[in-house]
Amino acid sequence: IRDRIYIDTAESLGRAIANRGDAVIYGAGKYGVMGATARGVTSEKGELIGVAPEFFKKDNVLYDKCTELVFTDTMRERKGVMEDRADAFVICAGGIGTFEEFFEVLTLKQLSQHRKPIVMYNVNGYYDSLINMMKKSVSEGFMSDDCLKLFTVANTEQEVFEQIDNYKEYTYDKYGFLRDGDNNG
């Protein structure tokens, strides 16, 4: 990770989550942004639940200070455990795994499989291009603009918590359109 801001903000977020009395449920890694978040949580004696597939045991990637460590057989099962146990999803800067997890919880929400807040933590404008790509998908007719209401974007740690605390639940049909008539589809 080239810019320290991603590590520093993740560690701060972890501390803040712990100080709120909330738990972090994550992929159990000790490296990168999520490793920094984990260190922030444990520095404040917070609850840190790691979920990892069995094959991670041999790769020396697991954070050893999780308050609970859950092992699964597959990556798919891992995501399912995290999705089921989470009350909200905060999407920090990350790579392909983060993108995949974001789009999975977004799709599940569109299909009314959960009604939990999804907050994209856009540190340093990291997700600006992805947000613009999604807007392009709307303007080109590939998805409804209602899909952009499935998640919120926070630029600061304070905004992350405000958006979770003030979450307004929308109800969508199976195609991602708002059921309350507040859509263009």
Question: Could you say what each language-model-derived stretch is?
Answer:
Residues 164:
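Hydrophobic "lid"/C-terminal helical patch
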Residues 92-93, 117-121, 148-151:
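Flexible, glycine/proline-enriched loop segments at strand-loop-helix junctions
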Residues 2-85, 125-157, 168-185:
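A cross-family phosphate/adenosyl-ligand binding-site feature
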Residues 77-112, 119, 170-178:
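Active-site/ligand-binding-proximal alpha/beta "capping" segment
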